[in-house]
Amino acid sequence: MNRYPSLFAPLDLGFTTLKNRVLMGSMHTGLEERPDGAERLAAFYAERARHGVALIVTGGVAPAPSGVTMEGGAVLNDASQLPHHRIVTDAVHREGGKIALQILHTGRYSYQPNLVAPSAIQAPINRFTPHALSHDEILALIDDFARCAALAREAGYDGVEVMGSEGYLINEFLAARTNQRDDEWGGDYGRRMRFAVEVVRAVRERAGADFIIIFRLSMLDLVEGGGTFDETVQLAQAIEAAGATIINTGIGWHEARIPTIATPVPRAAFSWVTRKLKGKVSVPLVTTNRINDPQVAEDVISRGDADMVSMARPFLADAELLSKAQSGRADEINTCIGCNQACLDQIFVGKVTSCLVNPRACHETKMPIVPAVNKKRLAVVGAGPAGLAFAVNAASRGHSVTLFDALAEIGGQFTIARQIPGKEEFYETLRYYRRMIEVTGVDLRLKQFVSAADLIGFDEVILASGIAPRTPAIEGIDHPKVLSYLDVLRDKAPVGEKVAIIGCGGIGFDTAMYLSQPGEATSQNIAEFCVEWGIDTSLSQSGGLRPEGPQLPKSPRQIVMLQRKASKPGEGLGKTTGWIHRATLLSRGVKMIPGVSYQKIDDDGLHVLIGGEPQLLRVDHVILCAGQEPKRDLADPLREAGKTVHLIGGCDVAMELDARQAIAQGTKLALSI
């Protein structure tokens, strides 16, 4: 029985047919610019095509050097570059898939000094100021887009996606906030949208009639001075007339201060926006953002919100997502949790994309899964992220794996993380591992403390025993009002109304989010999420912003977060999500103070020095989030007994809780042992 009839229905485009309603959305992987990038991209995309993706869209490639994402970024403007691309397109076609090249001119977001834009207005997220394009330069850029599309066809691509949203060049022409021209390319909306329309028209003319053209259209800019819904409809109709095959609806500029793809955003939070465009155009519409589950995708399409869904990061998490769904194995899907830690955050520091829950993503050629030649009996101590990743991957290769944990359930630190408001997706990772333990035949032993003697009979021992909270040397640290984050998050210790949190790392922020949450998290309610973040669901306001702005509720507790370092609190949080946590906590009234020296804790509260001045924080509880210590008690006795011992996860490096590193370490060891 097909549980997802709408999702797996074919889509007739006239000159070609897509086998289902799933578009793999564009993601920059960091491989586009690497010497071995073509071969690695080919393996990455081919694996997704093999498992049923109807149409893949590549990471953004600039039509001209002025539009690269960063200095040295990918460009397609010359026939000499075609062999690189043919490696990718041939690999996808061998697996029965279709692939489109995203043509992306980043405009004023280009992180290099020779950037261009409609007007010389610097982006708030870029240190470079763009050059304002002349009339002749605009015409040349239109030709660059058309040439890029023609080259894409020659390289074997089935189509292109013209990136017209997210605040990039085409979007900058459309919005009054970034287009302050008074010539034929600016002024009223008819002139501001001319560049977008001329680009699509030129692409269609050069690429031919039987070539897919997707236009990525911004439905909600989520910035002041952004577009209106009437303008969006006008543009969509003009883009269709100019030759677009599909319209893919985008949400939010990169400089917008409203979360659109991170874990706290509800699933399919913006499909209602796409639905508003249904009936206004006749080409298929694609909706996107936080669609990470086949049932969510099925519901979006079956209720008529869109004709297709775009899923990008979910295919990092699981290349087999669609084949598992279609074959009745949806419970085996490794679900994207929207954390961004191994994908977007990696890209922003110049590294290759991967995935927290699937470290093989974009590293398929370097991390092949092959049957074990020498099958071993392996003991894994600790069923946290590192231990789980090792156990299921090693067992899938044919090793006999026994997984021990002293607690009554698997998960380790993930069982704590999933309780943080907005991190409910972490339940999915634990569901996945529970199922894969069954599928791969891992022998799971819960509520079992093990000694070195219990492990002597195994060929090798993998210690993934995790961490213990570090106790800082502060006078009065054993006072009854002192709690660790485990006391609060795991053991549900009662916490008073006035709280000091020592430590502003990830655990400190998680604890503050947990204690400051008033009622249910809006991550499970689209309407409440939109109100909380000031999104205008009536689409009556420019930019899609409510006039009253965000309505983030206040914390029921008085919370102050403290750290020894003088740097900005939360500096080590992810680039794409850290600002969300900071903004949320500050809006709730949580205070953050760096540069603190801790003197003592007593009945009166926490005594500190701030800026060299003594202060007394009269709090009910002091919560310790001041780092971790590795738990490796078994390592030495096992080695003394002659056993081969591997340390992974927090028991190897415990400076900060890092699920990305833990799962990657466990997976790599499992694939090599």
Where in this protein do the model-derived segments appear?
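Short connector loops at secondary-structure junctions
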Residues: 64, 215, 250-255, 405-420, ...
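Helix-enriched interaction subdomains in cytosolic or periplasmic regions
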Residues: 337-351, 458-473
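Small-residue-rich anion-binding loops in enzyme active sites
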Residues: 320-336, 448-468
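Flanking helices and flexible, charged tails adjoining ferredoxin-like Fe-S electron-transfer domains
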Residues: 200, 364-373, 383, 396, ...
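Rossmann-like dinucleotide/flavin-binding elements
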Residues: 376-403, 445-453, 457, 465-474, ...
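Flavin-dependent oxidoreductase catalytic cores
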Residues: 1-381, 385, 390-396, 400-401, ...
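N-terminal Rossmann-like dinucleotide/flavin-binding domain of flavoprotein oxidoreductases
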Residues: 412-458, 570-596
